[in-house]
Amino acid sequence: MRGQRRWAHPFTLIRRLFGNAVFSSLTRRIVFFNLVALVVLVGGIMYLNQFREGLIDARVESLLTQGEIIAGAISASASVDTNSITIDPEKLLELQAGESITPLPSDEDLEFPIIQERVAPVLRRLISPTRTRARLFDADADLLLDSRHLYSGGQVLRFDLPPVDPESPSLADEFGTWFNRLLQPGDLPLYKEPPGGNGSIYPEVMNALTGVRGAVVRVTEKGELIVSVAVPVQRFRAVLGVLLLSTQAGDIDKIVHAERLAIIRVFGVAALVNVILSLLLSSTIANPLRRLSAAAIRVRRGGAKEREEIPDFSSRQDEIGNLSVALREMTTALYDRIAAIENFAADVSHELKNPLTSLRSAVETLPLARNEESKKRLMDVIQHDVRRLDRLISDISDASRLDAELARADAKKVDLEKLLGDLVEISRQIRGSKKPVLLDFVVDRKDNPRASFIVSGYELRIGQIITNLIENARSFVPEQNGRIVVRLTRSRLRCIVYVEDNGPGIQAEDIDRIFERFYTDRPEGEDFGQNSGLGLSISRQIAEAHGGTLRAENIAGKDGRISGARFVLSLPAGPHP
């Protein structure tokens, strides 16, 4: 148990520092992709091997310089072979008086043999400070000297015998060999020791015998690099032999390996920093998203009475902050809509209950009526309540589907001047016989004679607003000399419709209440229940859905008294022509 607790501490610490975001899918993706980018970068650096290529080039230049020096020292130690001189008798007869009988051969005719006893000390002295292997071949590419077998006097020689049972390479060694081969070019020739000591298997040696120096990079069976350079040993213009200098197997690989270890160490530190920064980044993303998600779940499970608060990240000034603001606004609108639906349901229940109660009372009383007059009066009450219920249900249905209908419909251009003219004319014809009212329509273009009255919206619903306002005004104008004026004007950005009447006006405390659902304040003499109280509420709802406003105010006369009511509908207008 102690061991388990000891192992649990790091995870507990990580959870405290970064929260549960460490184990989230988003966090794992951020860490993974950041590490993949870093791994690709490091892998590309190792695969391109620019450091190794530069190291090989530097080693080739170094070996060529070293080879030129050693080849010069070897050629200087060579002597002319004068053990036998051939004299041509015919040339002897051609000699003039005073000429020497000794032949004077040209440089090409002289031979400068490489004497091993003289060259070996020179080669040993120049090679010993380095780990370079030197091999000297004669003009026939036969091996004369090998620095591996140059020994000074009195030196004790020791040879390590191979083990009786050679151990198989470990998994780490095999992986190292495979990794080296993976990062090395696949076109490098395989290094082999020359059979019988003849250097003709080396192309650079054969080229050097023609006087051209060269360099070749080979690889051993273990994947280790060997760099070889061949330099001709020349005396005057005669090639006496070839000096072949080679690096020890693994010398370059050790340097490259050390460089790769340094890169891996840097990669480890960078990966650690990358993971920490990724965790910090994910904590600033995943944790807020998790809190927003949890709050959204609580909103879904809760009700309108207990409002759940969405976390406020608006101070972040980023996409998460914008998401937080949007969710908060959406949640507020959702709660307001739920509350409105609940209030609407309560109001509907209350409004339906009144006519139902009256209807029930009339139905229960009808069998008890003693005469026909009482029965007729009760039947009139029943019919009146039925009509009232029908009107209520129709208006309630219209109000309930209004939002959905406005959300589904496509807004179109509506010419208010034409729409209002048609509605006023229809209203004159339909209502003219019931209450004589003077209904005027005025278009005000004083500020701009060419002003257009085009708005974007739903013609049927905008017409419903105007119809409700005209009918509402008609119910309040006096029986004699009643007048309603519909006036259309425009400001720079809005079209404004005024519906004015010369009725009694509106009580100051009721100017806002008249737009509440089921609120009725009818004039004296009008039958109770003729209006559902939803007309003005629906009209304001339609106006707000169009981005407009609907308000009411009283008209003050010259003496300061109220001379009527005015309803003002304002809608966003299109541009001026």
Swiss-Prot record:
Cytoplasmic side: 1-29, 282-577
Primary localization: membrane
Enzyme nomenclature, EC number: 2.7.13.3
Transmembrane segments: 30-50, 261-281
Membrane topology (Periplasmic): 51-260
Reaction equations catalysed: ATP + protein L-histidine = ADP + protein N-phospho-L-histidine
GO molecular function, one term: phosphorelay sensor kinase activity
PROSITE patterns, sorted: HAMP, HIS_KIN
All copies of domain Histidine kinase, residue ranges: 347-575
Key word Transferase present: yes
GO cellular component: plasma membrane
Domain HAMP: 283-339
Role summary: Member of a two-component regulatory system ChvG(ExoS)/ChvI involved in regulating the production of succinoglycan. Activates ChvI by phosphorylation.
Description of how the protein assembles with itself and partners: Homodimer.
Name this polypeptide is given: Sensor protein ChvG
Species assigned in the record: Rhizobium meliloti (strain 1021) (Ensifer meliloti)
